[in-house]
Amino acid sequence: MLKRLIEVRDETGCPVPLLVKVAPDLTSEECTDIAQVALETGVDGMIVSNTTLARPSGLIGRHAHQAGGLSGPPLFAPSTALLAETYRLTRGRLPLIGVGGISSAEDAYAKIRAGANLVQLYTALVFAGPGLVGQIKSGLASLLARDGFSSVAEAVGISQGAALVRQPIKPSQAATPRYTRG
């Protein structure tokens, strides 16, 4: 199906990026399969991860056992673990968007260090408002400087200890993957 979507996109002459979004409830085998398909088909990136159906035992309140997707802080640890695994499996060759439980600069930095090129906010943005974006941006700049990085790109995947060959992104390539495929 992905190959056909890419063909249709390419036939239209409108190079809209195609990203695959995955849930944190994947098994290791499913994660491996999806990463391999993403690399083979040439998707433009992955969004890791979506809401979870799991309910951690520490949830409190009247909605603790509510059916449906769970998002926000309880999703941070499993989604960050899946992000790190996806980064390892794709060997840094696909841009990854880290999602799930990000509510601070420290959370965003953890996602970046696990392999995210970008981060996505939702739940925390709803509760904290648009000022949260500036707080995270400022805090992230401080964390990067503290650790000797001059850009987010330098910190991507650093927790993995992987030495990948990265190519600097040019403005004309903004919608294309930043890593060499091969």
What are these regions (language model features)?
Residues L26-E40, R88-G92, I102-V119:
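Catalytic cores of alpha/beta
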Residues P56-G72, L125-F149:
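C-terminal helical cap(s) of enzyme catalytic domains, especially alpha/beta-barrels
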Residues I112-R113, V119, A128-D147, E154-G182:
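C-terminal extensions of enzymes
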Residues V37-G92:
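Glycine/Thr-rich beta-alpha phosphate-binding loop at enzyme active sites
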Residues L2-I6, C31, A35-Q36, T80-L83, ...:
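Generic structural signal for well-ordered alpha-helices
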Residues L18-V22, M46-V48, P95-G100, V119-L121, ...:
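Hydrophobic faces of well-ordered beta-strands that scaffold small-molecule active sites
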Residues E11-L26, R88-G98:
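Short beta-strand/loop segments at the ligand-binding rim of alpha/beta enzyme cores
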Residues G45-R55, G101-I102, A108-Q135:
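Glycine-rich phosphate-binding active-site loops on the catalytic face of alpha/beta enzymes
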